[in-house]
Design a protein with these regions (language model features):
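Short, charge-rich, low-complexity alpha-helical interaction segments
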Residues: 1-22
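Alpha-helix N-cap/N′ positions at the starts of helices
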Residues: 24-30, 62
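Non-membrane alpha-helical segments in proteins
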Residues: 30, 46-51
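Solenoid-repeat scaffolds in large eukaryotic assemblies
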Residues: 32, 43-45, 79-80
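Hydrophobic/aromatic side-chain positions at a characteristic register within alpha-helices
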Residues: 36-37
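Long, charge-patterned amphipathic interaction tracts in eukaryotic proteins
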Residues: 50, 54-135
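N-terminal accessory interaction module
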Residues: 101-192
Length: 192
């Protein structure tokens, strides 16, 4: 593992520990943390989201966005996205970030947002947005010949509605790409 990959993994581990800390019971939090420790992130995310829903625990918008990115990173967004979106909001903290369930907003052709050259088959699926300014983090998927979107995103695109400002593209193959894209939406728009 190269240094950059090790740093990205360590940073993701810190987010994981913070998310596990959302669970009030030490046994639950330890179970989720244990899943990270043994490399069973998919199972840990299922336990975490399941317990958040079962116990009707409040989840603020920042944690919900981190859960979404974590689920996307570990390939379980398709199974857990609905639950993540359904987690009870934290009434003590006004929501600035909104996580979209797949299908809540229609995918848009990438060529309508990104400069040329862009594949005509690439679609941007709105995923996380800033409620204040509308800045959107979208997952870029290929529209396959069988008329479905590719399972994994090729990249992450942060863009403003109406094309104000240049879009930023984060290639999935880059370490920490989804986290970097989330940071732009969370910290870079000035609404936070």
């Amino acid at each position: 593992m190269n240094d950059r990959r090790a740093q990205a993994y360590a940073a993701e581990g810190a987010v994981w520990a913070r998310l596990a800390g959302l669970l009030p019971g030490a046994d639950d939090a330890d179970e989720v943390q244990g899943c990270w420790d043994i490399g069973e992130q998919e199972a840990g995310l299922e336990v975490l989201v399941g317990r958040l829903l079962e116990q009707e625990l409040a989840v603020d918008d920042a944690a919900r966005a981190e859960l979404a990115v974590m689920a996307g990173q570990w390939g379980v967004w398709d199974r857990l996205g609905t639950g993540i979106v359904a987690c009870r909001p934290d009434p003590a903290r006004p929501a600035r970030l909104r996580v979209y369930e797949d299908g809540a907003e229609p995918p848009v052709p990438a060529w309508s947002v990104l400069p040329d050259p862009v594949s005509r088959e690439l679609r941007l699926v709105p995923w996380i947005a800033c409620a204040g300014c509308g800045l959107v983090l979208a997952r870029a998927h290929t529209y396959e010949e069988w008329e479905e979107l590719s399972y994994l995103a090729q990249s992450y695109v942060v863009h403003a509605p109406g094309g104000s400002g240049a879009p930023r593209v984060f290639e999935r193959a880059e370490d920490g790409a989804a986290w970097s894209a989330l940071a732009v939406v969370r910290d870079g728009c000035g609404c936070g």
